[in-house]
Amino acid sequence: WDQAMDVAGFRKLLSGSIDLSKSTIYMSQGKYVMSETGGLGVIIRKDIKAIKGGYSLLSEGTDLTNRRIDTYKTVISGDVNGNNQADSGDCGLLLVKGGIIGIEGVTFQYGYLSNNDAKSNECGSGIYINGNVNSTSVELTDCIIRDCKTEAVNGQGGVAGGTAIL
């Protein structure tokens, strides 16, 4: 927790060039909005060993014992406009274009993608996986996906695209 970052730092970590293939990202309870504006949200093109939610805000130092995913809800959200629904002005959550990623104990909520923001291979509002089938997958453990919506003609609201292991 000594290296905690804000939401903008988290988004940059996921989409940037830092190697996370051997790293675990620990997330405390709270809402992490994936963009400051509408659109696709965070685009990931790399391996991430693990993203684990459900930790208390009171966690300190290197203590990882204060974790209860049902009590300390960690939400990856697209609710840019803050009205607790997926609608115009909000963003998609994760667009995975490459990498093998493990995510545990996270709720994905209020992802939204308009028809104007969507492309033929970038049209999911929740978690959209679009990469090489041999090197791109997302494994979700103890996660919830809800209230995601897309108006894209070919889009999907929840998990869509490539390989997802639930």
Residue ranges and their predicted role:
Residues 111, 115-116, 148, 152, ...:
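Short, structured coil/turn linkers that connect adjacent secondary-structure elements
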